[in-house]
Each structure stands twice: as C-alpha cells, then as structure tokens.
C-alpha cells in the first residue's frame, strides 16, 4: 500500500512539473480573405504602411517587428522596394481590475436578502464581498490589414484578442500576431478560438 501511494505521489508530481512549464494563450480571432483572382497571398512580398498617428511611435516599430516574424512564419517576405502588398499593423492593450468572474471590476458590491424560515421565523441579512486587492487583467488586441498595392484593395484582414492575467505584453503580443495568422491564407468563416502554448 505504501508503495502504491509513493507511485501515485510521484506521478502527480511529474504531472504538475510538466504543466508548470507552459501556459496557454487563448485568442479570439476573426480573419477575412478577399483576394481577387490573380492576387497570390502565399509567398507575397510586402512592406509596412503606417498611419500618420503611428509615424515616430516606438510601439509601432515594436509591433512591426513582431508582425514581421509572424508574417515570415506563414511565408510572406518583407521587401520594401519590390512589395506587392502593404501591411498595416494595429496594436492595443489595456489593463483593468477584475471581479471574481473576470469582468471589469465595478467597485464594491454586496447583497441584501430577506427570507422566511420554514416553518417558522423570518430574517434579514446583509452581505458584502470583495477580494483585496482585485486581480489585474490585461486585454490585448492586434490587427493586420493586407492591401494589394496595384488596386488598393484589402485582400486579407485579421484581428486577434486575448484577456488574461499575464503582464508580459511583449510575449503576449507576439503570440497574438501568430494567432491572427492561423490558417493563413484561407481562414474559416466567422470567429475562431486559437490556443497557443508558450513558456511561463
């Protein structure tokens, strides 16, 4: 019996050790491909495009570096001089205090309940509940808009978002760019969930 318990504890420790090295970034992704006949997305050459508000913004440069790695992983090649496509990169992140269910925390909360005992008595109660301090959650979103330079038409658009407790934005944004390009260049219709494991 003692030997069986020892084996069980060792198996449990091995399982916990295996789980502790990775975390899952679950992303909500919406991608739309609208390339006309004759426009080849796979292996296409591209350059980055910036909005006036992004010029000189250091975050835009970091976003482009991360997007470039994700674009290279699906076969697109950066070539500023010979580009067929332009890529507009979007990146946004916010943080908020979360209630116990993961929604933005509205402040203090409580409840008042009035009841009647069975078969006798009545009662009134008041309760307050709050965690100290409420946990911080992070919402991050990325987008990529690929446009054919000859026609000016958008040929591929994708958005990915993630809500979670991790504060390492650089790693999470890089993972979101990978998720945004899942199933490139033929994404399924409608929203999809993309899970990517990354080290803790």
Language model feature labels by segment:
Residues 10, 39, 78, 128, ...:
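Sterically constrained small-residue positions within well-ordered secondary structures
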Residues 49-51, 90, 115, 147, ...:
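A structural detector for beta-sheet-dominated domains
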């Amino acid at each position: 019996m003692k030997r069986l318990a020892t084996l069980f504890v060792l198996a449990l420790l091995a399982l916990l050790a295996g789980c502790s090295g990775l975390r899952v970034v679950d992303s909500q992704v919406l991608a739309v491909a609208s390339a006309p006949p004759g426009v080849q997305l796979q292996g296409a050459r591209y350059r980055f495009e910036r909005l006036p508000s992004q010029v000189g913004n250091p975050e835009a440069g970091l976003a482009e570096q991360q997007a470039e790695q994700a674009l290279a992983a699906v076969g697109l090649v950066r070539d500023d001089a010979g580009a067929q496509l332009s890529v507009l990169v979007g990146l946004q992140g916010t943080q908020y205090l979360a209630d116990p269910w993961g929604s933005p925390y509205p402040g203090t909360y409580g409840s008042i309940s009035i009841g009647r005992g069975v078969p006798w008595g009545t009662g009134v109660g008041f309760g307050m509940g709050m965690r100290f301090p409420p946990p911080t959650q992070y919402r991050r979103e990325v987008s990529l808009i690929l446009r054919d330079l000859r026609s000016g038409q958008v040929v591929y658009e994708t958005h990915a978002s993630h809500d979670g407790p991790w504060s390492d934005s650089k790693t999470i944004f890089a993972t979101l760019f990978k998720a945004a390009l899942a199933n490139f260049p033929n994404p399924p219709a409608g929203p999809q969930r993309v899970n990517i494991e990354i080290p803790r």
